[in-house]
Structures are given as structure tokens and as C-alpha cells.
Amino acid sequence: MASELCKTISVARLEKHKNLFLNYRNLHHFPLELLKDEGLQYLERLYMKRNSLTSLPENLAQKLPNLVELYLHSNNIVVVPEAIGSLVKLQCLDLSDNALEIVCPEIGRLRALRHLRLANNQLQFLPPEVGDLKELQTLDISTNRLLTLPERLHMCLSLQYLTVDRNRLWYVPRHLCQLPSLNELSMAGNRLAFLPLDLGRSRELQYVYVDNNIHLKGLPSYLYNKVIGCSGCGAPIQVSEVKLLSFSSGQRTVFLPAEVKAIGTEHDHVLPLQELAMRGLYHTYHSLLKDLNFLSPISLPRSLLELLHCPLGHCHRCSEPMFTIVYPKLFPLRETPMAGLHQWKTTVSFVAYCCSTQCLQTFDLLS
């Protein structure tokens, strides 16, 4: 087997192959033949799935500098080394079905990376530097142990497909609603109890799957007329069992994001002072300066400055930004034309988040 492997690599070196297939070779170590002398300078695609590799060499980028695709699916790799960041031409990296516990921050240096697959590992967090991957189109981090997603993920402006199924997420950063190219978002089998108010506001986002998040009872009304999966959501549970802000209408109850400070009703006549001030600041700086960076960080607490950059949400009726208070209105999915598509497998409601009593009274999901 060793001689056959050496022969395969030698032929690839002599004939300057661009593709090399080393799948199913029972390899426990990265082949030294690949790293000899100058390495394989012409190699662009390396396939090494279903081996028993536990690590990657530190000089990988030096010996294989022109790698465009690296497939290491189904090995036993525990750590993505710092050296991976030197593969500056890499566009596809597949480390699915390994034993990954750590992804090094240097992965953010892979500025050409378009597809990153890290499914079926043991990751508890992703480094913030993932947000530096401006060309990233596909990110699959399903079946890990993630509790949160890095907020800088919203800086991946080319991201189209994000899959985070079967993790331990209990919330989704509202900043992800700013992803301009996101077309499909799958978060099935997590611990979500609420979704960002603006999820679905982007016209690019067409597919959202949140199946089997049993505490999830409300979907932002922006998701109406999108392709959604929500089977197994909205299981009966006592509100007191979940320490989250909730809103009830009739026999329906939904949980709201922790950033919501107050829930308005149709009987309110005046907005809270902080909400009025934030809306005024927002419109002033957007209309006069066109750039919130002109606002000195010293003038406002960091939390409020962040809200100005990324509001809690936008009114589902008039698109007015909201910062502290929302006026919710429920539309049970079973009472909409979409009921037949879900075959009664869910008890969730669409939630319209409005900015005022006027918008609350005039909003109609079905009109």
C-alpha cells in the first residue's frame, strides 16, 4: 500500500497533475511524499476523504501553495492549524465528519474561500475572524455544539447558504438579517425560542428552515410567502418554565428577543422617551450625515450606539426602525392559506412587529 501511494504521488509530481485522489487509503499521517523537496507546486485539488488523519502539517501551504480545493471529509482531525491561513488561493475547504474542537483565527486569512464545510464535528464556537471571509458563499456548521454564532458573521457579504442544523443555539444574532446575499438559512434542531424581528425582510432570503425547535412559537411575518420549514415547533410548554419575555393573544403565546425592553398595546398613546430619542437620532444621522461613523463613540453608551447601527427591527407595516419597544400582532399559521402546506404539524404563529398603535391596527398579513 505504501509503495502504491508513493508511486501515485510520484506520477502526480512528474506529470504535474492538478488533481490528486487519495481517498480510502487508511492513512494515519499526512503523506511525506507530498511534502518532499518543493512539494507539488502544480496541485490544485487534493482529495483525502475517509482516512484516519489526525493533523495537518505546518508547512502545507509552503509545499502545496496553489491548492484551490482541499477535501478532508471523514478523518480524525482535531485542530485546524494556523498554517491553513497561508493557503491564499483556497476556495473550497471540507473538514466535515472529523473531530474538530478548534478552528484557528487564521482561517480568516483565506480571502478567496467560497465554500467552508465543518459539519459533524465538536465545535463549541467559531472564531470572529470567520467574518473576514468576504467571498464565502456556503457555510455548513451543522451537527456541532455551538451555543452562539459570531456576530461578525454578518460581514460575510457573499454568503448565500448558511446551515447550522443540530447545534445548541438559543438565539440568532439580529445582525445576520443584514446579510445581503443570504438565500437559504437552515437552523433546524436547535434550542431557539425566538427569531430576529427582521428575519425575512431581505428579498434575497427565500428559504428558512427552523424545524424541531420545540420552544419556537413565533415566526416574523416577513417570512410569510417564503419557503419555510417549522415542523415540530411550538410544543406545549408553561411560559413560567422559560425565562423570556413573552406576548400572549388569546390562547397563543410567543417569546420575544431579549433586546425588546417593552411591549406596546393598541391602548398606548405615547412612545417611551428612549424610543423617541433613538428614532430621532437615527433619522438625524441618516438624513444629515448618511454615516453613523460620524457619531462619536463617546456621545452614547456602546449598547445604544450599536442599536443605531443595527436597530432591533423594522416595522412590518411601515419599515420605521424600532429600538426598545414593539407592538406585536399574532396570525396563527393554521388560520392562513399556508396551513395546508404544513399538514398541521406545527402550532406556530406569524408575528407582525409594529412600531406604533396605528401600524398595529392597520396591519393585515392576509390582505
UniProtKB/Swiss-Prot annotation:
Keywords: Leucine-rich repeat, Repeat. Signal peptide: none annotated. Pfam families: LRR_14, LRR_8. Gene3D superfamilies: Ribonuclease Inhibitor. InterPro entries: Leu-rich_rpt, Leu-rich_rpt_typical-subtyp, LRR_dom_sf, LRR_domain-containing, LRR_R13L4/SHOC2-like. LRR repeats lie at residues 16-36, 42-63, 66-87, 89-110, 112-133, 135-156, 158-180, 181-202, 204-226. GO terms for biological process: intracellular signal transduction. The keyword Repeat applies. This is Leucine-rich repeat-containing protein 28. It comes from Homo sapiens (Human). The gene is LRRC28.
